[in-house]
Each structure stands twice: as structure tokens, then as C-alpha cells.
């Protein structure tokens, strides 16, 4: 650089003009200072001072194509068959394609991904709960239908049981009345006495059954007492029938039993109509028997009184026996239907209890899932706040110390 020579400056001592040589000022010495280095008085670098951590190598790194393929395969294997697979695949490109130069961006994207995954898991759990709730409601509707059927069957069983009771009492009373007539007329004192005994046992059997239904006799006692009374009643009835009508009574009883066995289905189908007419039949039995005896007496005047009484008693016992068999068959069928409906109802209740336990378990898992989601979000917010505080502290530090 050349010097400039001027003549317009004077010295303060003599006032004469002397040439003045002006030289440019030297440029200041500039040195580069690295963060964390301090200079001493001599201009050297001191080893003490504020030292900032070096940036991580992953900040400036990029995901290679091979690493991206491995990440994609891993996520596909994990998320295969789940409802959130589409959502995760949408975020794979976000996490693997952008340059990880900004930790803040990575944290924000990671937080969004975790939040969306938790929402998907919640939706899946809620869908499972709704599905189980619908199944539970279907079970409840089925149970209500079963309960209605059970109530209807119980009513029908009650009606058929009432009809069976009516015929049971009618048989017992008819046996006593016919036996008394036979004893009083002298036609068959022994057979009449047997019929009276059979009727008395029948009435005792009906009274014991009624007491058991009222709770006066325990079920354990009825399991022993009921079959015994029934067997005695049947035995006395058979003996009195044989003694009254002779050997032909056995064939008659066999024919009646065969007819009842062959016509059980049709009789059961017509049981409802017959049950409705039970009262009419029971009230008209005595009139029918009386008119039958009168007609038989008028038509066969030459017959003896013994034949008339036997014919009337046979007609009465056959009519009452057939009615009793029909009502007993209907009653047994209704009892079986009632037990079947009760079994179905108990099974449906067990299924409902199992579904309710599954719903409760899903609710617990959903609550745990919500709690874990809240904890993860709190952790992410803490990380973001800590990162912000660190950046704020770094921005507030002086460049030199």
C-alpha cells in the first residue's frame, strides 16, 4: 500500500510547513473462537470455561434405503391383521423419509403417531365392547322369550294338574259310592268293600299330594310315600275289578291300556279341548251313569240287579279312568316342557354371565389403555418442555465468557 504525502500540515513548534506522511492503520488481528474456549491475557486458548456437548451423529444422519426396507418389513410383521395397520403404514414414510435434522420435528411426529395408535386401540376395544353388548342384548331377548314360554307352560301345567286332581277325586269318590251301593244291595259285599278301600286310599293319596304342594310334607317324604300310596290304590282297584267282573275284566283292562298307548299322541293333541270341558264332564258323569242304568234297566228288565250295577259301575270307572289317563298324560308332557324351558333359561343365564365377565375385562383393559396413553403423552410433553428449556438456556448464554 502506498503512502500519501501532503504539505498542508504545520508543526506546533515552528509553525512551518513540513511534509506529513499518512500511512493506513493496520488491520485488527481476527481470530476464530470456538464455543467453550477462553483466551488468557497472552492470547492463548485456555482449557477451562463453558463446554457445550457435541451434537449427536444421528442428527445429521439419514435413513438409507436398506434400513427403510427393514423398518417397513418389521412394521408389517407387527401390524399385520390389526385395525391400525393402515394408519401405521401412513406414518412409516413420515418417520423414515424426512431428514432427522430437527429433533423437535421428530418428537412432534412421534407424539402424533403414538396418540393415533392409542386412539386406534381404544376404537378396537370399544368395538369389542359394543359387539359383546349386542350379543348380551340378544341373549336377554332370548331369555325374555324363554321366560314367557316358561310362564305359559307353568300355567298350562297348573291347569292340567288341576284337571288331574279333579279326575283323581272323581275316581276315588266313584269307587267309594259304587262300593257302598254294592255292599248295601248285597250284590258283592267283598268286591264293594275292596272298591271302598280303593276309593279311600285314592282320596288319601290326593290329600297327601295336596299337602305336599302346600309345603306341609317334605319332598323327601313324598318320594317314599307317594309311590307306596299309588301302588296300593292301583292294586286295590285291579283286585276289586277282577272280583266284580270276573276274568273278562283283565281282558278289558288290557284292551283299554292298549288303546291308551296307541292313542296317546292324539289324546295329548286333544288335551287342551278336553281340559276345557273337564268341568262339564265331571258334572255330567252322575247324570250319564244314572240315565245309562235306567235305560239298561228298561231295556233289559229280565236282567238281574247285579248285572245292572256291574254295568253301571264299569261304565263309570271306564269313563273316569280314560279321563284321568288323558289328563295325566297331558300333565306329564307339560311338566317335561317346563323342565326343558327351565334348562334353556339356566343355560342362557350362564352365557350372559360369561359375556358380562368378558365385557368387564374389556372395560378394565380400556381403562388401563387410557392410563398408559395419558402417561405416554405426559412423557412426550415433558421431553418437549425439557428440550424447549434447554434451547432457551442456550439462547440466553453469552457468546463469550
Curated annotation (Swiss-Prot):
Protein's membrane topology: Multi-pass membrane protein
One matching Pfam family: SseC
Compartment annotation: Secreted; Host membrane
Name a single GO cellular component: membrane
Ranges in a coiled coil: 129-160, 345-379
Q: Where are the transmembrane segments?
A: 166-186, 225-245
Q: What happens when the gene is disrupted?
A: Mutant displays reduced virulence in a mouse model system. Although the mutation abolishes all YopB/SctE synthesis, it does not interfere with either type III secretion or type III targeting. Deletion mutant cannot form channels in liposomes. Mutant can secrete YopE during a HeLa cell infection but it is unable to translocate YopE into the HeLa cell.
According to the record's subunit comment, the protein's assembly and interactions are: The core secretion machinery of the T3SS is composed of approximately 20 different proteins, including cytoplasmic components, a base, an export apparatus and a needle. This subunit is involved in the formation of a pore, called the translocon, in host membrane. Interacts with YopD/SctB. Together with YopD/SctB, forms a multimeric integral membrane complex with a mass of between 500 and 700 kDa.
Function noted in UniProt: Component of the type III secretion system (T3SS), also called injectisome, which is used to inject bacterial effector proteins into eukaryotic host cells. YopB/SctE and YopD/SctB are inserted into the host membrane where they form a pore and allow the translocation of effector proteins into the cytosol of target cells. Is an essential virulence determinant. Required for YopE translocation.
**Similarity-based family:** Belongs to the SctE/SipB/YopB family.
Name the UniProt record assigns to this protein: Type 3 secretion system translocon protein SctE
Q: What organism, scientifically named, is this protein from?
A: Yersinia enterocolitica
The gene it comes from is: sctE
Amino acid at each position: 500500500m502506498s503512502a500519501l504525502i501532503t504539505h498542508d500540515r504545520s508543526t506546533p513548534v515552528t509553525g512551518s510547513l513540513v511534509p506529513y506522511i499518512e500511512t493506513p492503520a493496520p488491520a485488527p488481528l481476527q481470530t476464530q473462537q470456538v464455543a467453550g474456549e477462553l483466551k488468557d491475557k497472552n492470547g492463548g486458548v485456555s482449557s477451562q470455561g463453558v463446554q457445550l456437548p457435541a451434537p449427536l451423529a444421528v442428527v445429521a444422519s439419514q435413513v438409507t434405503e436398506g434400513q427403510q426396507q427393514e423398518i417397513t418389513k418389521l412394521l408389517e410383521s407387527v401390524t399385520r391383521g390389526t385395525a391400525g395397520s393402515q394408519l401405521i403404514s401412513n406414518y412409516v414414510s413420515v418417520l423414515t423419509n424426512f431428514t432427522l435434522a430437527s429433533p423437535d420435528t421428530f418428537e412432534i411426529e412421534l407424539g402424533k403417531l403414538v396418540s393415533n395408535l392409542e386412539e386406534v386401540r381404544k376404537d378396537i376395544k370399544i368395538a369389542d365392547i359394543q359387539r359383546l353388548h349386542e350379543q348380551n342384548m340378544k341373549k336377554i331377548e332370548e331369555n325374555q322369550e324363554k321366560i314367557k314360554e316358561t310362564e305359559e307352560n307353568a300355567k298350562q301345567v297348573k291347569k292340567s294338574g288341576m284337571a288331574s286332581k279333579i279326575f283323581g277325586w272323581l275316581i276315588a269318590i266313584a269307587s267309594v259310592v259304587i262300593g257302598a251301593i254294592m255292599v248295601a244291595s248285597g250284590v258283592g259285599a267283598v268286591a264293594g268293600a275292596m272298591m271302598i278301600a280303593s276309593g279311600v286310599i285314592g282320596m288319601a293319596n290326593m290329600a297327601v299330594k295336596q299337602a305336599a304342594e302346600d309345603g306341609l310334607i317334605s319332598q323327601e317324604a313324598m318320594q317314599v310315600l307317594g309311590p307306596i300310596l299309588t301302588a296300593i290304590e292301583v292294586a286295590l282297584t285291579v283286585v276289586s275289578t277282577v272280583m266284580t267282573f270276573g276274568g273278562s275284566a283283565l281282558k278289558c283292562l288290557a284292551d283299554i291300556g292298549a288303546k291308551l298307548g296307541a292313542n296317546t299322541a292324539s289324546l295329548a293333541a286333544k288335551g287342551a279341548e278336553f281340559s276345557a270341558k273337564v268341568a262339564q264332564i265331571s258334572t255330567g258323569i252322575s247324570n250319564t251313569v244314572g240315565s245309562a242304568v235306567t235305560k239298561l234297566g228298561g231295556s233289559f228288565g229280565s236282567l238281574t240287579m247285579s248285572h245292572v250295577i256291574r254295568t253301571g259301575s264299569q261304565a263309570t270307572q271306564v269313563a273316569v279312568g280314560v279321563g284321568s289317563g288323558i289328563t295325566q298324560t297331558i300333565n306329564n308332557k307339560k311338566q317335561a316342557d317346563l323342565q326343558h324351558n327351565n334348562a334353556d333359561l339356566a343355560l342362557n343365564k350362564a352365557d350372559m354371565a360369561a359375556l358380562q365377565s368378558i365385557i368387564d375385562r374389556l372395560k378394565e383393559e380400556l381403562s388401563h389403555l387410557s392410563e398408559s396413553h395419558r402417561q405416554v403423552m405426559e412423557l412426550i410433553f415433558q421431553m418437549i418442555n425439557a428440550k424447549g428449556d434447554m434451547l432457551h438456556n442456550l439462547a440466553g448464554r453469552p457468546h463469550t465468557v
